[in-house]
Amino acid sequence: MQQETTDTQEYQLAMESFLKGGGTIAMLNEISSDTLEQLYSLAFNQYQSGKYEDAHKVFQALCVLDHYDSRFFLGLGACRQAMGQYDLAIHSYSYGAIMDIKEPRFPFHAAECLLQKGELAEAESGLFLAQELIADKTEFKELSTRVSSMLEAIKLKKEMEHECVDNP
């Protein structure tokens, strides 16, 4: 019994060390990067086809298999957002943002979720961050336009709310 406990503890320590050292569950199970890419393509295509629950399952598995690939968390967040699971989507986007701090889509999509929840100040903060991350990157020109439009809409909504309070 004592030996079993010691073996389990040693295994847990070895696993923790492996994961902290950059290892993934995919590596442990010898799942190739090609296989992960095929799964990603499957999930992406399911998402694009509106099969959010199916895509969600695959993205969730991908996040477990390789918790370092931020694309998987972007996909997971997008599925959750499409299914109206805004809090869970925000969690996915937040984790992805930690993995890729220069990716403006994470704060942008989190802001969309926050807007759906009616949390204007928090959404505005996310949009400002997205705007800052976009800077003058040409590949995010369309996203930049959307961010600007959403910030303007929030500004107008705040002004309307102020007018309603000032002029009841």
Curated annotation (Swiss-Prot):
Pfam family, one: TPR_3
Keywords: Chaperone, Plasmid
InterPro entries reported for this sequence: T3SS_Ca_resp_chp_LcrH/SycD, T3SS_Ca_resp_chp_LcrH/SycD_sub, TPR-3, TPR-like_helical_dom_sf
PROSITE patterns: TPR_REGION
Known function: Mediates the negative regulation of the lcrGVH operon by ATP or calcium. Acts as a modulator of the yop operon expression.
Family label: Belongs to the LcrH/SycD chaperone family.
Name of this chain's protein: Low calcium response locus protein H
Species whose genome carries this gene: Yersinia pestis
Gene name for this UniProt entry: lcrH
